[in-house]
């Protein structure tokens, strides 16, 4: 009877109504941006630079360089958010090694983390999907949903 209370309220602002990319293209752009996040010059031209969440955070009239900085910060934040849930800390470690500090082959990074390469690849895929979901919630104007996806630490009184 009161189930309408649990439905999300749509934003009145038209800026949130239509994402600049459909979900599949958004996911492809996130995967590409994650691969390039440690090399900002390679983020030039990434479709996420025109995504609503980047434009809102960068502000009106932001340069491409400013939008790149915002995108990098959001990718780094999403990776950090993974570590807030104990069951995803392995995903965070893998994402950090693959995307933020890619200094050697994935095989070597898996070895350094003490996990089989197949597990490393599986964790990397899961982390990438989670990060995509987190950013998608921001893109469609559901920042509260992004916080629910990340389940941030809560203080205990």
Task: Label each PLM-derived region with a short phrase.
Residues 83-105:
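Short amphipathic alpha helix immediately N-terminal
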Residues 1-86, 106-107, 114-119, 123-126, ...:
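N-terminal interaction/assembly modules
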């Amino acid at each position: 009877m009161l189930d309408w209370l649990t439905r999300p309220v749509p934003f009145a602002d038209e800026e949130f109504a239509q994402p600049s990319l459909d979900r599949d293209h958004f996911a492809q752009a996130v995967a590409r941006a994650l691969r390039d996040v440690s090399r900002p010059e390679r983020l030039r031209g990434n479709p996420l630079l025109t995504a609503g969440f980047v434009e809102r955070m960068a502000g009106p009239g932001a340069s491409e360089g400013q939008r790149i900085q915002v995108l990098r910060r959001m990718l780094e934040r999403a990776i950090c958010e993974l570590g807030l849930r104990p069951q995803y800390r392995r995903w965070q470690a893998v994402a950090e090694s693959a995307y933020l500090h890619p200094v050697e082959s994935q095989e070597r990074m898996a070895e350094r983390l003490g996990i089989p390469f197949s597990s490393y690849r599986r964790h990397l895929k899961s982390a990438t999907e989670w990060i995509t979901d987190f950013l998608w919630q921001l893109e469609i104007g559901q920042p509260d949903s992004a916080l629910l996806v990340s389940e941030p630490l809560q203080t205990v009184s």
